[in-house]
């Protein structure tokens, strides 16, 4: 299993599937469709049934039931795209066997070092096989670890018919990282009663609470005048954007929050004197606080427009997804089954809120309750991203055990 996981994973991460927020098509990048087609071929090769990919890049496939029992159809999902925070082009995965617990030099020329001093959690991976970046790209374990684990789990179940299970549906979705994953996902065609995303982090993570999420795009329209004659005429759009940001509570940012605390996050600020654009994401687990955060953004935008004149500040504020806890708690047994599966494999479940989003958040509101299971990765969305091969083995085993337990309980 280890060898298959390593082979598939290092193949998948080399396909550039970074999504593109600015694109209006689906999938937003050609690389996602390229990987989708690779997976379709491989799914057919291992013996999966009803293998399809649609024009939008959604891959679906079926592992038929091998039991006489009436077992609910369950699904497992992962996303094709990688994050936009750092390039996903020309990913060169580095394999470090029997990690010694010390610094890992990812890139000597650029002096990029993955160090336990900066990332103390590395200590728990001593003796494990770590897969890292070369210090110039992200790795893409989010979520190609999940894709790999689903592929290997399905292959294992096909080759071990003695493990009884009901019908299993799997799906690989595009554009999760920009919040569009479930937009064109056909829940009815997928046909599962419950599903799980393999999109979590370290070993044992199990999540069924997510943020309420919104995005704010703000355009500041200034007035560019020659600096020599600018008095009482120039309006600097960049300074307007800075003034806006000064009204956002500094302590309520990702770098100062954890647990159930929400935040405002300035993703980007670009512009010049004439025009500047800021992009924020807004996150909170509590719906009332979520609404308050959006109201604050809108209020600051309105007040700045009143100060600088009509049309000087343009705000586009839209909701992205909501806390899935409301939809999963009524069927909490689907979380309990995963907890039991983990314990059967000597994994201690670590149930915590997702400080992020998964396709499961939106799918749960579309009628498909979808908790999130660990994929094994750490430090997602950056050059220090890595995954332990042993954690991927455990995640694969959890998929298999969940399928077995659903059949056993009927």
Swiss-Prot record:
Chain residues that bind Zn(2+) 1: 79, 142, 199
PROSITE patterns: ARGE_DAPE_CPG2_1, ARGE_DAPE_CPG2_2
CDD domains: M20_peptT (cd03892)
Cofactor: binding comment: Binds 2 Zn(2+) ions per subunit.
Keyword flag Methyltransferase: no
GO molecular function: metallopeptidase activity; tripeptide aminopeptidase activity; zinc ion binding
Main location: cytoplasm
Gene Ontology BP annotations: peptide catabolic process; proteolysis
InterPro entries (UniProt xref): ArgE/DapE_CS, Bact_exopeptidase_dim_dom, Peptidase_M20, Peptidase_M20_dimer, Peptidase_M20B
GO cellular component, one term: cytosol
Enzyme class: hydrolase
Keyword Zinc on entry: yes
The family this protein is said to belong to: Belongs to the peptidase M20B family.
UniProt name for this protein: Peptidase T
Encoding gene, per UniProt annotation: pepT
